[in-house]
């Protein structure tokens, strides 16, 4: 085997590979001889079919299999020989081949992994959110828990913030229907952010049985992307309007939250402890977002098109799945790949940066860190020990906690390198309630 590599651009390579024919012909003959021992054909006993008939019947198929395997092996060998890291799949083009040629040749065009040069992070500013959980924050959380367990009763007045409504909805873009609720309608609590804010503002002031038609102009950066920059006309019928009736903060409420003896003070302590854990979790999320952005902002990187295209496909599939769950007819939705390229490029860039950094700085999560992450997952379930057992019953299930634990190591590495400053934040801002 011989291979020559041509550099087309920073990442694109063209490799011409020559493979001797004689070993391939020998392999073809060997396979046909083996096949002749077992092949069955009408008019012949098994294994007694003449070799020339077997060759005539199966020769082309066997030759194609041998050639395909030869290309795969030789490409892999040539890549290793030339110390190339292939990104994505190669495009293979076979050169013309005459019967007596001593070699077959093909041209493989592909991209290689880029160099990842992570810059100086010492000037990258990262703000560490600071929030102390006090009585006011606990009270807000208790109010949320009470609202979550509210019962609702019909009212004849117009709808307002906090009411539960059921609506039937049809949405149009340029007079083409893009969304329609089913016969059960759509349940919403006004003001809880279930839809775009401008949409929710139209839901107040309407009585059960009324109808309202209005338009919403979505911004260019709206998610999901198919509504970005579009004006949507909504035809909404208000089926029901119900007001909330909150439960009392008492022993019965405590028991509903799992405090078996109904001790209200114990319930308050558990809520406080849980809230502190959630605040710590939100702070870690904010730090991770900033750490990853610092890496993106300080890394020179050209991303292979193959990686971007693969990520675009994944994002489109994810968006389609999300729309299906919402009852949107995908036949009326055109998800242009260009809508996803910016996010796909960011995702692919970050993946390359993290891979380089983890390998360079040896940041892979160890067994103890993975175990700690599994324990964190398990605490969300009623029987955490069973969840831990489930994860360790199949090592593939540990991939997700291992990846998240490794990301935590990356964040810690960035925080040690960057300029980190503490910043006091409001409870509602941190919890996403504002």
From Swiss-Prot:
Keywords per UniProt: Cell cycle, Cell division, Chaperone, Cytoplasm, Isomerase, Rotamase
Reactions the enzyme catalyzes: [protein]-peptidylproline (omega=180) = [protein]-peptidylproline (omega=0)
GO MF: peptidyl-prolyl cis-trans isomerase activity; protein folding chaperone; ribosome binding
Localization per Swiss-Prot or TrEMBL: Cytoplasm
Enzyme Commission designation: 5.2.1.8
Disulfide bonds: none
Main location: cytoplasm
Keyword Cell division tagged: yes
Domain PPIase FKBP-type, first and last residues per copy: 162-247
Any one GO BP annotation for this protein: protein unfolding
Gene name of the record: tig
HAMAP family (alphabetical): Trigger_factor_Tig
Role summary: Involved in protein export. Acts as a chaperone by maintaining the newly synthesized protein in an open conformation. Functions as a peptidyl-prolyl cis-trans isomerase.
Family note: Belongs to the FKBP-type PPIase family. Tig subfamily.
TM segment ranges: none
EC top class, as a word: isomerase
Record text about domains: Consists of 3 domains; the N-terminus binds the ribosome, the middle domain has PPIase activity, while the C-terminus has intrinsic chaperone activity on its own.
Keyword Cell division recorded: yes
Highest taxon listed in the record's lineage: Bacteria
Name of the protein: Trigger factor
Organism: Methylobacillus flagellatus (strain ATCC 51484 / DSM 6875 / VKM B-1610 / KT)
GO CC terms in record: cytoplasm
């Amino acid at each position: 085997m011989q291979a020559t590599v041509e550099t087309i651009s920073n990442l694109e390579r063209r490799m011409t590979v020559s493979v001797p024919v004689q070993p391939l012909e020998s392999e073809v003959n060997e396979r046909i001889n083996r096949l002749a021992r077992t092949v069955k054909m009408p008019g012949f006993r098994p294994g007694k079919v003449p070799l020339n008939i077997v060759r005539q019947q199966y020769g082309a198929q066997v030759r194609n299999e041998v050639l395909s395997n030869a290309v795969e092996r030789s490409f892999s060998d040539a890549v290793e020989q030339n110390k190339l890291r292939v990104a994505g799949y190669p495009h293979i083009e076979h050169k013309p081949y005459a019967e007596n040629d001593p070699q077959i040749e093909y041209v493989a065009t592909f991209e290689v992994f880029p160099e990842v040069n992570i810059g100086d992070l010492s000037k990258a500013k990262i703000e560490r959110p600071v929030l102390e959980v006090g009585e006011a924050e606990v009270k807000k959380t208790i109010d949320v828990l009470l609202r979550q367990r509210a019962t609702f009763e019909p009212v004849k007045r117009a709808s307002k913030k906090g009411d539960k409504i059921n609506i039937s909805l049809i949405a149009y873009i340029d007079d083409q229907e893009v969304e329609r609720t089913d016969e059960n309608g759509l349940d919403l609590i006004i003001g809880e952010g279930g839809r775009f804010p401008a949409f929710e503002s139209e839901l107040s002031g309407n009585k059960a049985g009324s109808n309202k038609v209005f338009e919403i102009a979505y911004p260019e950066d709206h998610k999901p992307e198919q509504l970005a920059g579009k004006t949507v006309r909504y035809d909404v019928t208000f089926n029901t309007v119900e007001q909330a009736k909150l439960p009392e903060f008492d022993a019965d409420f405590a028991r509903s939250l799992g405090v078996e003896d109904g001790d209200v003070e114990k319930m308050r302590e558990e809520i406080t402890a849980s809230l502190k854990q959630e605040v710590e979790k939100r702070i870690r999320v904010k730090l991770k977002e900033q750490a990853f952005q610092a890496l993106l902002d300080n890394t020179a990187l050209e991303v292979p098109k193959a990686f971007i295209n693969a990520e675009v496909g994944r994002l489109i599939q994810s968006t389609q799945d999300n729309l299906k769950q919402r009852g949107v007819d995908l036949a009326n939705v055109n998800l242009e790949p260009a809508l996803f390229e910016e996010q796909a490029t960011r995702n692919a860039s970050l993946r390359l940066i993290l891979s380089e950094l983890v390998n360079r700085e040896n940041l892979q999560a160890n067994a103890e860190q993975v175990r700690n992450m599994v324990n964190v997952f398990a605490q969300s379930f009623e029987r955490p020990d069973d969840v831990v057992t489930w994860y360790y019953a199949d090592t593939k299930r540990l991939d997700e906690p291992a990846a998240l634990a490794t990301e935590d190591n990356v964040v810690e590495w960035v925080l040690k390198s960057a300029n980190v400053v503490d910043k006091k934040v409001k409870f509602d801002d941190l919890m996403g309630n504002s």
